């Protein structure tokens, strides 16, 4: 796929999953970390460097063996990376050393974001770690405030919530001997996150917004998509994209945000690498965050929608697997339950179990968040009822894996009309999906559906709409697929308004329009279109036409035999 060698500073679980993605693309990787680190366990190479990613000499050894140098952890020696840019001008380093410098010190990160007009929590430096200085912080920011380590902090380590002045001595003891800063407490209702990919050319691409749930300052769960309105997701996407645009270089970035009670969004922290909140992408998205990072730093193609969910109905929950606090390896019982749960995938990192140590994660994928949560409850032991799938359900799932026809409507009030199309497609054995996509109330969802449909294997779209009936035309404007419009009869004008709206499309945006409320014909037309891809559907259509003809001929013969009066009496 690519002859260049990628050097990775750090061989933990993130490096391990970068290597997994690289292996699929036949990209060679060399790793700098301790012997038998998680990433090295799955990469049999004599070129790996045993050492520390913060040691200048070890970093230089790695640089001599690669064409592109990247990181799986930001706590690396930046001066050495800057020297390498001079010493090895052909060596590409992503993210750029300057970006790593700006981000690895969290207070400098905040100052950079403020300078670029990005909304963040109010912060102040703690020049001297003393009770007096923290009393002054409490006076300026108010209690509670968060005391944070400026560097070398992750997974909740390096944070302490100071609820009142009596807690100051404890905070100083916990965070002693490190540079500190303080943040004003953000009264958030949810913590959100998003993975942002930045290309070599500076283009940015967003993954779905997710919601993270923390326990003991460590990420426990990640819900994808986030359980917030579409409008909030859009604002979060724009905020995160603008933040990443302010940094030089390329790669993937994890952006954590606070969603406040007021509806305001604030950036919490940024990581210049793959992130825990993006692990769900391995199973839920077209491209995982790890492959996306490789595509970015190697300037490989980034096709349209490569960061989107695999299907319009994809929902996911990521559960971190932490070392049990009391019994070593007890967390593996959770993994065993996950293996018995449909739609769940287990990822273990090859790390020795220690209390609260991340040793793996579990991705749970389903067509609804409620179904994801049902599976989560079994995996975590909240319920002992195993999740079973009947033979019929398995067949349904197999049919839904790659739907060929998308049936959409602007409102559930259109479903009685559109259900006839569903019945026809079932009779013809056509796999299809059904959902609600409002052109006016959910425009972003409509756009995402139209743009992603062809990438997901959909061959044609049936769109039902009443009233203004903009849905079929708007979808047709954003997809290369054939769109069949079904005018739905409303309370006014008997559906003629819908018919005129759909049929009168401008040149260049065709919509095949059927009669008012006639989703049956829409489905039959869809089957005919599918015949161009699969001759079995043409055969089924021929059989359908013969059956129609036979039904009419039987009726004609009966009418001719008994006469019209007897025919009407017995009909």
Swiss-Prot record:
All copies of domain ATP-grasp, residue ranges: 110-298
UniProt xrefs under SUPFAM superfamilies: Glutathione synthetase ATP-binding domain-like, N5-CAIR mutase (phosphoribosylaminoimidazole carboxylase, PurE), PreATP-grasp domain, Rudiment single hybrid motif
One GO CC term on file: cytoplasm
Modified residues (Phosphoserine): 37
Keywords: ATP-binding, Decarboxylase, Lyase, Nucleotide-binding, Phosphoprotein, Purine biosynthesis
Pathway linked to the protein: Purine metabolism; IMP biosynthesis via de novo pathway; 5-amino-1-(5-phospho-D-ribosyl)imidazole-4-carboxylate from 5-amino-1-(5-phospho-D-ribosyl)imidazole (carboxylase route): step 1/1
Top EC class, one word: lyase
Pfam families in the record: AIRC, ATP-grasp, PurK_C, RS_preATP-grasp-like
Record EC number: 4.1.1.21
Binding site for ATP: 138-193
Catalytic activity: 5-amino-1-(5-phospho-D-ribosyl)imidazole-4-carboxylate + H(+) = 5-amino-1-(5-phospho-beta-D-ribosyl)imidazole + CO2
GO molecular function: ATP binding; metal ion binding; phosphoribosylaminoimidazole carboxylase activity
GO BP terms in the entry: 'de novo' IMP biosynthetic process; purine nucleobase metabolic process
Zinc among keywords: no
Signal peptide: none
Family according to the record: In the C-terminal section; belongs to the AIR carboxylase family. Class I subfamily.
Miscellaneous comment text of the record: Present with 5410 molecules/cell in log phase SD medium.
UniProt name for this protein: Phosphoribosylaminoimidazole carboxylase
Annotated organism of origin: Saccharomyces cerevisiae (strain ATCC 204508 / S288c) (Baker's yeast)
Lineage, opening ranks: Eukaryota, Fungi, Dikarya, Ascomycota, Saccharomycotina
């Amino acid at each position: 796929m690519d002859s260049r060698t990628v050097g990775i500073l750090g061989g933990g679980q993130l490096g391990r999953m970068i290597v997994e993605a690289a292996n699929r693309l036949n990209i060679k990787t060399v790793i700098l970390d301790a012997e038998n680190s998680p990433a090295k366990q799955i990469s049999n190479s004599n070129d790996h460097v045993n050492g520390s990613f913060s040691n200048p000499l070890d970093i230089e050894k790695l640089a001599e063996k690669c064409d592109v140098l990247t990181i799986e952890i930001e706590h690396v020696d930046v001066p050495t990376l800057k020297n390498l840019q001079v010493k090895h001008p052909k060596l590409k380093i992503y993210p750029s050393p300057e970006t790593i410098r700006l981000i690895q010190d969290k207070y400098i990160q905040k100052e950079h974001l403020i300078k670029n007009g990005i909304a963040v929590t109010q912060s102040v430096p703690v020049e001297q770690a003393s009770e007096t200085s923290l009393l002054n912080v409490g006076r300026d920011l108010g209690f509670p405030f968060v005391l944070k380590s400026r560097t070398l902090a992750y997974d909740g380590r390096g944070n302490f919530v100071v609820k009142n002045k009596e807690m100051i001595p404890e905070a100083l003891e916990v965070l002693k001997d490190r540079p500190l800063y303080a943040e004003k407490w953000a009264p958030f209702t949810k913590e959100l996150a998003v993975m942002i990919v930045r290309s070599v050319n500076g283009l940015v691409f967003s993954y779905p917004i997710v919601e993270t749930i923390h326990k003991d300052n460590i990420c426990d769960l990640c819900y994808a998509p986030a359980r917030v309105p579409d409008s909030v997701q859009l604002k979060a996407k724009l905020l995160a994209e603008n933040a990443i645009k302010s940094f030089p270089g390329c790669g993937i970035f994890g952006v954590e945000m606070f969603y406040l009670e007021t509806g305001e969004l604030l950036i919490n922290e940024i990581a210049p690498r793959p992130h825990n909140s993006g692990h769900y992408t391995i199973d839920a998205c077209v491209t995982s965050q790890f492959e996306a990072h490789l595509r970015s730093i190697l300037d490989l193609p980034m096709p349209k929608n490569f960061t989107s969910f695999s299907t319009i109905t994809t929902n996911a929950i990521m559960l971190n697997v932490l070392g049990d606090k009391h019994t070593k390896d007890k967390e593996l019982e959770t993994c065993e339950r996950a293996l018995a749960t449909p739609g769940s995938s287990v990822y273990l990192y090859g790390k020795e179990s220690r209390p609260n140590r991340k040793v793996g994660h579990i991705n749970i994928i389903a067509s609804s968040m409620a179904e994801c949560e049902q599976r989560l409850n079994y995996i975590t032991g909240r319920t002992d009822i195993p999740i079973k799938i009947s033979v019929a359900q398995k067949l349904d799932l197999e049919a839904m894996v790659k739907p060929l026809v998308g049936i959409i409507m602007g409102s559930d009030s259109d479903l009685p009309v559109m259900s006839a199309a569903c019945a026809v497609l079932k009779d013809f054995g056509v796999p299809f999906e059904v959902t609600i996509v409002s052109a006016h109330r959910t425009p972003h969802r409509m756009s995402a559906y139209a743009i992603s449909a062809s990438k997901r294997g959909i061959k044609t779209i049936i769109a039902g709409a009443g009233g203004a009936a903009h849905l079929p035309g708007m979808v047709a404007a954003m997809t290369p697929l054939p769109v069949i419009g079904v005018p739905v009869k409303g309370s006014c004008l008997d559906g003629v308004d819908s018919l005129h709206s759909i049929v009168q499309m401008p040149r260049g945006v065709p919509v095949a329009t059927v009669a008012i409320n006639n989703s049956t014909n829409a489905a039959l037309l869809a089957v005919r279109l599918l015949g161009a891809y699969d001759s079995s559907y043409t055969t089924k259509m021929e059989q359908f036409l013969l059956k129609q003809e036979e039904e009419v001929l039987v009726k004609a013969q009966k009418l001719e035999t008994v006469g019209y009066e007897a025919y009407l009496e017995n009909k």
